[in-house]
Amino acid sequence: MTGEGYKQAIVVRRDLGMGRGKAAAQAAHASCEAVFLILESGRPEWRRWLEMWRLQGQAKVVLRVESLAELQEVYSKAVEEGLPASFVRDAGKTQLEPGTPTAAAVGPAPSRLVDRITGGLKLF
């Protein structure tokens, strides 16, 4: 095992006024979708990152953005950098309209790479 740390950053929109439970559910969706993406990707590097993250306790940080544009920017940067990333749109069954973008996840990946994308964001 290397000394490098691994984590996942989950980014949630605060401008939507979601309740705490709703925001937590959207964060969970983003986290799970990023893991599913890795498992389905066939990318050995991502699979290695996932395993290291799992072995190190699955560190997660939940961060906030204040707009759709900010959420899209985080997701786009992660994809451009070659990191596993998910982008969640709500199903519209409770508080939001169907298709409303709510959250994204970056990683699991080496912490230094995740921080390049999300390091300037505030905690949710």
Curated annotation (Swiss-Prot):
GO CC annotation, single: cytosol
SUPFAM superfamilies in UniProt: Peptidyl-tRNA hydrolase II
Protein location: Cytoplasm
Lineage: superkingdom: Archaea
One term of GO molecular function: peptidyl-tRNA hydrolase activity
Alphabetized UniProt keyword annotations: Cytoplasm, Hydrolase
Record field: catalytic activity: an N-acyl-L-alpha-aminoacyl-tRNA + H2O = an N-acyl-L-amino acid + a tRNA + H(+)
Pfam families the record matches: PTH2
CDD domains: PTH2 (cd02430)
Enzyme Commission designation: 3.1.1.29
Keyword Ribosomal protein: no
GO BP term (any one): translation
InterPro entries on file: Pep_tRNA_hydro_II_dom_sf (IPR023476), Pept_tRNA_hydro_arch (IPR034759), PTH2 (IPR002833)
Keyword hit for Cytoplasm: yes
Known function: The natural substrate for this enzyme may be peptidyl-tRNAs which drop off the ribosome during protein synthesis.
Family: Belongs to the PTH2 family.
NCBIfam families reported for this sequence: arch_pth2, PRK04322.1
HAMAP family the UniProt entry points to: Pept_tRNA_hydro_arch
Protein name: Peptidyl-tRNA hydrolase
Organism lineage string: Archaea, Thermoproteota, Thermoprotei, Desulfurococcales, Desulfurococcaceae
